[in-house]
Amino acid sequence: MTDKSKDNSKKLLQCSFCGKNQKEVKKLIAGPAVYICDECIRLCNNIIQETKTTKKIEDDELSYLPTPHEIKKHLDNYVIGQNHTKKVLSVAVYNHYQRIRNVSKNKDNVELGKSNILLIGPTGSGKTLLAETLAKLLNVPFSIADATTLTEAGYVGEDVENVIQKLLQKCEYNVKKAELGIVYIDEIDKISRKSDNPSITRDVSGEGVQQALLKLIEGTLASIPPQGGRKHPQQEFLQVNTANILFICAGAFSELSKIISKRIDTGNTIGFNCNLKKQKKKKSEQYFLQQVQSKDLIKFGLIPEFIGRLPIITILKELNETALVQILCKPKNALIKQYQTLFNLEKVKLEFTKEAVTSIAKKALSKKTGARGLRSIIENILLDIMYELPSMKNVEKILIDESVVNSHSLPKIIYEEKNKSKKASGE
C-alpha cells in the first residue's frame, strides 16, 4: 500500500488540453480535476483576440465616411486636373456607401438603386489612379480587371467571376469585406459588339461578356471559386453578394467622338455646307464627348442593358502640357519626388531644372501616352546614372537639364570634395 501511494505522488501532472506534463511547460494551473498550461492559455488568448479584432473590423467597417468635399480634396492631393470627374466620383462614391450604411434606417422602405460608374477618357488621363485613390481613402478592397481577357463561360479566357475572385484575394477571402469593395474594369470599350448587325458567329469576347457581366454589376449572389473555376472544378464555392460592390468601368472609346459628331451634325447640312464643315473641324474631340448619350454608346457597341447598369457617365479630359508638368512635381507621390527619394537612399540629391521638366512633358505629349508615358521617359533619362551611381563615391548631386532630356548631353555629376561638375562619362 505504501509503495502505491509513493508511485501516485511521483506521477507527473499533465495539461488537460495539450497533454504536456508539468516538466515540459513553464506553468501549470490547476482547476477542479482539470489542468491548463501557460502555452494553452496563450493560445486561447490569441483566439479570443482574433475574434475580437474580426468583430471590430466588421463593426467599424465604413464607420467614418468622408463627405464629397473631403473626398475631392483627397483626390486633389494625388490627381491633377479632371475637376468635374472628381466631383462626379466624390458624390457617387459617397451616395453608394451612404446607402449601404443606412439601409436598416430606411423607414420608408424606399429601395435605393446602385449607381455604378463609366469613365471615358484617353490613355494616361488618370482613370485608374482615381479609382485606386478612392479605394485607399475608404479603406475598402480594390481590384483591377482587364475586360479584354474576359470571355463567356466555356470559352478560352477568364470567366467574369474572376473579377470578384481577384477582389477576394485582396482581402484574404474575407467575404464580408469583399462585398463592400470596389471593382475597376479597364478597357471596357474593347468588349463592344463587333457589328450592329446580328452575326451567325458567336461574339464570345464582346456582347457575350457584356451579357455575362450584367447580373454581376447589377447585384447577384455569385458563386466564386477561390482558386479559379476552370483549373480546380472540384473546389467549394464562396457565395458573394455583389449588390454592394461598386463597379467602375473605364475605357478610351477612341471612335466614340465620330459617332457623336455624326449625330449632332445630322439634319444641319441644308445649305451653307462649307461653313458647317469648317465649324465641325474647329470643334474638338472633347467637345463631342461631352455631348455623349446612351444611344451613342449603343451605336459604339455596348448593349442597352449594359449601359443601363452604368447610370453615371463622366468624361476625362486629355492632359495638356501644363497638367503634365504639374503631375511631375505637384502630387504627394509625384514622379520626380519618387526618383528624388530613390536617389536619397544613395545619399545623393537629384535635381531637375524647370526647362527639363517642361521638356519631359512635351515628350509625353508628342507620344500621346498621357501621364502613363512620363515614367518611361524619366527611366530612360536616368538609366545610365542609376546603373553607375551605387559604385561611385563622394557624389553630392545629379543635375538634369533640358539638354539631358533631349539626349544632347549626359547628366551632370557634382562631387562633394571639390564641388566640381562632371559628366556621367567620368571625365
UniProtKB/Swiss-Prot annotation:
> Where in the sequence is the signal peptide annotated?
none
Q: Where does ATP bind?
A: P122, T123, G124, S125, G126, K127, T128, L129
In terms of CDD domains, this protein maps to:
RecA-like_ClpX
SMART domains membership: AAA, ClpB_D2-small, zf-C4_ClpX
- For whether the record's keyword set contains tRNA-binding, the answer is no
In what residue span(s) does the ClpX-type ZB domain sit? 2-56
Q: Which GO terms describe its biological process?
A: cell division; proteolysis involved in protein catabolic process
Q: State the superkingdom.
A: Bacteria
Coiled-coil residue spans:
none
Gene Ontology MF term list:
ATP binding; ATP hydrolysis activity; ATP-dependent protein folding chaperone; protein dimerization activity; unfolded protein binding; zinc ion binding
Q: Which NCBIfam families does the entry link to?
A: clpX (TIGR00382), PRK05342.1 (NF003745)
Give the protein's biological function. ATP-dependent specificity component of the Clp protease. It directs the protease to specific substrates. Can perform chaperone functions in the absence of ClpP.
HAMAP family listed in its UniProt record = ClpX (MF_00175)
**What does the record note on quaternary structure?**
Component of the ClpX-ClpP complex. Forms a hexameric ring that, in the presence of ATP, binds to fourteen ClpP subunits assembled into a disk-like structure with a central cavity, resembling the structure of eukaryotic proteasomes.
Put simply, this protein is called ATP-dependent Clp protease ATP-binding subunit ClpX
Q: Which organism is it from?
A: Buchnera aphidicola subsp. Schizaphis graminum (strain Sg)
Q: What is the lineage of its organism?
A: Bacteria, Pseudomonadati, Pseudomonadota, Gammaproteobacteria, Enterobacterales
